[in-house]
Amino acid sequence: MLICLTASHHNASFEVLEKLSVAAPSVAGALMEQNDFIAGAVVLATCNRFEAYLDVEEPLTAARALAVEATVDVVSGASGIARDDVRGSVDVKCGDAVAEHLFAVSSGLESVVVGEGEIAGQVRRALEGARTGGTTSTGLERLFQTASNTSRGVKTRTGLQSAGRSMVRLALDLAESRIADWSATRVLLVGTGAYAGASLAALRDRGVVDVHVYSPSGRAQKFAGPHGIPAVEGRDLLRALAASDMVVTCSTAPTAVLAAHHMQGAAAVSGDGRRRLVIDLGLPRNVDPDVVTVDGVELLDLETISLHAPLRDLTATDDAREIVSTAAAEFRAASAEDEVAPAVVALRTHIFDVLEGELERVRKRGDSSDATEKALRHLVSVLVHQPSVRARELARQGEGARVVDAVQALFGLDVEMPAAVSSPVAVALSRTAEAGQAS
């Protein structure tokens, strides 16, 4: 069973999202380590959302409740947010709703800037991170890979992502009234992560030619070389700030990298009283809000930028949602087929075992021939093909349980299913009950 806990700009404040983003790197591993019944976990954290996707081994209401509470506990511990506040900041989606939600997210339909293209890469990197951490599962792999395919379908079949929508481009739109000549604007880019390339591209599209890059983690030179821009070392940060008209931050640093004292130092170095616009695209925030106490400094942060998100292109959005709904329906159908896979395997194994037994008896009598064996194997393959196909068709129609029952009843087979008594969920429930009695 798939479960998603989601907090976004729709239901949580940016203050909460900022704290959740700090917790994100440790959540999936902790969930897997502490809970046997969670088969996989992928955490997606962006500038406007935090989501934990879980693959729970048993489709039980108890499993859902335990998984949700376990996730709330881990997130609370990692973020420092009170447990009740975490629970109040997340929506829970279960089963079929998870696929449709992630497909919409990866297609940019749930973003602050609807149709923005960066989210698809963030979804892909979330899965890659889970692979690296060893927390993914077969179900989550298929879910996230299908989400990426769906996003590509939305991009190629609708005009939703054709306008280059993104948070950085929206921020530059808002900065337009403050910039007299983009080609003469000197920009300092702070951060070299996945969003830095998109930020640089957006600046260049505006006509900006003077961009320097600074990395709090010391990776400026590695980013600067391939992108053809100068790198700024830590000792030169104040001089770079002093020479800049605009600062764009998109670092993944867990704490603020710029504050009022940096801007005061820059003003002292430049001595020209110039105005500086700081655009903070980081979550957690890269820039301490106290920079606005420095004369001439204006700050655009994610919360402010989000307030100016454009209205949706209704036609393109409707087309995209239709693609998402179709993809989600197909994902549900394919997942339903998996439910009857043990029964189909058991049926095929039984029939081919019977065939092998008969062939062995024929060989012992000396009546066997290669042609006879080949013909019998072909006949059995033909006979089991239609029931196998029909089983998958019935599963897609929601009749998977009947297929399993029929195979067991007609052939006397014991289709292997998880043992509820010794299951991780049962054990967890037992522990919970014991803890309640002890208290």
Curated annotation (Swiss-Prot):
InterPro entries: 4pyrrol_synth_GluRdtase, 4pyrrol_synth_GluRdtase_dimer, 4pyrrol_synth_GluRdtase_N, GluRdtase_CS, GluRdtase_dimer_dom_sf, GluRdtase_N_sf, NAD(P)-bd_dom_sf, Shikm_DH/Glu-tRNA_Rdtase. One of its GO terms (biological process) is protoporphyrinogen IX biosynthetic process from glutamate. Possesses an unusual extended V-shaped dimeric structure with each monomer consisting of three distinct domains arranged along a curved 'spinal' alpha-helix. The N-terminal catalytic domain specifically recognizes the glutamate moiety of the substrate. The second domain is the NADPH-binding domain, and the third C-terminal domain is responsible for dimerization. Catalyzes the NADPH-dependent reduction of glutamyl-tRNA(Glu) to glutamate 1-semialdehyde (GSA). The gene is hemA. Substrate binds at residues 46-49, 111, 116-118, 122. This is Glutamyl-tRNA reductase. It comes from the Bacteria.
